[in-house]
Amino acid sequence: MRNNCNNNQYDYENYDNCRNKREQTHVHEFEGSTMFAEECEDRHNHRFAGVTGEAIRRGNSHVHKLATNTDFVDHYHQICDTTGPAIDVGNGKHVHLVKGYTTCRDGHRHQYIFATLIEAPTVNENDYDC
């Protein structure tokens, strides 16, 4: 139930900032809802959405880091995690599984499990003839 939030999650020094011409790698959108927490009148869950960081090579696949806040229902939680490796969905596309726990707020935390959205699901390099 450890949460991976920390101040050093992203390596901002290596991001393209006009002086650094490093080629960027792909990202994924994500959205989901946490599992319910607490009981009776306090029982609730939260929604979240965001965009992952760039691909990070891991073995013969890759992963992505992500960080976002949930919506506010008297309080909010943070989600900071690393995806699992790429899962092929055909046609050269893939998704990633993410499973973990939010930060603890208001005396509780929420479990989440979701898959990222397909990277560039509608983009085809021939779609934009200039």
Locate predicted features.
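Peripheral, non-catalytic segments of secretory and membrane proteins
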Residues: 1-130
